[in-house]
């Protein structure tokens, strides 16, 4: 299996286009296709905060429909899904940018994008186990003893990370560094927590290099285990990046 897994995009369509071209994909009829048959992987959080979230929904839906990509949802995807279902969610923490794009559309187009995203989300696995179990794509990561499980505890971990229930002074949840304790055989490729450069710890790789916060958009090439990045066009917000001891 040959796949290029892309970190949290958050509506950064311009950088996504540049990254796929750098990876050797050719854009045809609005989607990137690799001449050697490589597929794309997405760790979730396609939308929110960035300028072109709805375009990313369109593209990823088209890729998944054509079996050219593997997509797993992130916490922002989960919140957008609940918004589209009419649930009472707070339109904050970036969701407001996607909702503004959505509300600017004519009603017929609103319904089209709503249905499209609901279908994408409901058709996606919580996490993807690929290459006969040698590779797992999970938005915020996954413990080795959680692989194969789908219960509420696992869903919380996969969408939000190993949260303690406490909060940092800036309001973000305190998270344990689960990657340091991972002892599984499968490679875990994840995002969710922005880091200045791809973080390899054991057989885990965090590829969320904070594109929407002015970092970069990064892909991990599997099975080569090399990374490819393009710089962000967004303003740099250093306090959004996590450092590890």
UniProtKB/Swiss-Prot annotation:
SUPFAM superfamilies the UniProt entry points to: Metallo-dependent phosphatases (SSF56300)
Single annotated GO MF: nickel cation binding
EC number: 3.6.1.17
Record-given protein name: Bis(5'-nucleosyl)-tetraphosphatase PrpE [asymmetrical]
InterPro entries: Ap4A_hydrolase, Bis(5'-nucleosyl)-tetraP_PrpE, Calcineurin-like_PHP_ApaH, Metallo-depent_PP-like, MPP_PrpE-like
Pfam families: Metallophos
The reaction(s) this protein catalyses: P(1),P(4)-bis(5'-guanosyl) tetraphosphate + H2O = GMP + GTP + 2 H(+)
Cofactor needs: Ni(2+)
Enzyme class: hydrolase
Function recorded in the entry: Asymmetrically hydrolyzes Ap4p to yield AMP and ATP.
Keywords: GTP-binding, Hydrolase, Nickel, Nucleotide-binding
Recorded family membership: Belongs to the PrpE family.
Gene3D superfamilies in the cross-refs: 3.60.21.10
Organism: Geobacillus thermodenitrificans (strain NG80-2)
């Amino acid at each position: 299996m040959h796949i290029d897994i892309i970190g949290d995009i958050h509506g950064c369509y311009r950088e996504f286009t540049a990254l796929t071209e750098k990876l050797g994909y050719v854009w045809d009829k609005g989607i990137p296709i690799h001449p050697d048959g490589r597929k794309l992987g997405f760790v979730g959080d396609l939308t929110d905060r960035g300028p072109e979230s709805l375009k990313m929904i369109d593209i990823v839906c088209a890729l998944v429909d054509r079996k050219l990509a593997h997509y797993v949802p992130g916490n922002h995807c989960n919140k957008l899904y609940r918004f589209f279902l009419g649930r009472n969610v707070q339109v904050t923490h970036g969701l407001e940018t996607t909702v503004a794009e959505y509300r600017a559309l004519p009603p017929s187009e609103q319904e089209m994008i709503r249905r499209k995203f609901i279908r994408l989300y409901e058709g996606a696995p919580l996490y993807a186990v690929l290459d006969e179990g040698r590779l797992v794509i999970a938005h915020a990561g996954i413990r080795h003893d959680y692989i194969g499980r789908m219960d509420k505890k696992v869903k919380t971990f996969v969408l939000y990370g190993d949260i303690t229930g406490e909060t940092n002074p800036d309001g973000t949840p305190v998270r344990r560094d689960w990657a340091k304790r991972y002892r599984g055989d499968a490679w875990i490729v994840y995002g969710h927590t922005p880091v200045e450069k791809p973080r390899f710890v054991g057989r885990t790789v965090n590829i969320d290099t904070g594109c929407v916060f002015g970092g970069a958009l990064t892909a991990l090439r599997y099975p080569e285990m090399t990374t490819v990045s393009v710089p962000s066009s967004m303003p740099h917000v250093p306090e959004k990046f996590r450092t590890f001891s």
